[in-house]
A protein has these predicted regions:
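Extracytosolic ligand-binding ectodomains
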Residues: 1-106
Length: 106
């Protein structure tokens, strides 16, 4: 019931993508050995429900994802007012948090 009104959010999509990427890594590694799966994770690609193909960064395992800016509507949903043309590489260490300047640059 009400399936036409159900929407996904970023945490739901992240869980879905994460499970599928883990499955792909296990298949690539041909084992569930943690170290081998971690090694197999980098560089993976997966078509997410948002429509974009996401890539797992080889050096830090963060996802390259699209950036969207939305305007909240009265019904609690969003109108996307800006969307990048494609996924953007993640910056894992915020330059706005003290102490991060000494962390590895990517």
């Amino acid at each position: 019931p009400n399936a036409d009104k159900v929407v996904t959010n970023d945490p739901m999509e992240a869980t879905y993508v994460g499970m599928h990427m883990w499955k792909q890594a296990v298949e690539k590694a041909k084992t569930t050995d943690v170290d081998k799966v971690i090694e197999a994770m980098g560089g993976q690609k997966f078509k997410a429900p948002c429509g974009f193909e996401l890539t797992m960064d080889k050096t830090n395992h963060h996802l390259h994802k699209p950036v969207m800016i939305g305007e909240i509507r009265g019904d609690g949903q969003f109108n996307v007012v800006y969307k990048t043309k494609g996924p953007i590489r993640a910056q894992p260490w915020s330059p706005f948090i003290a102490g991060n300047e000494s962390k590895q640059k990517i």
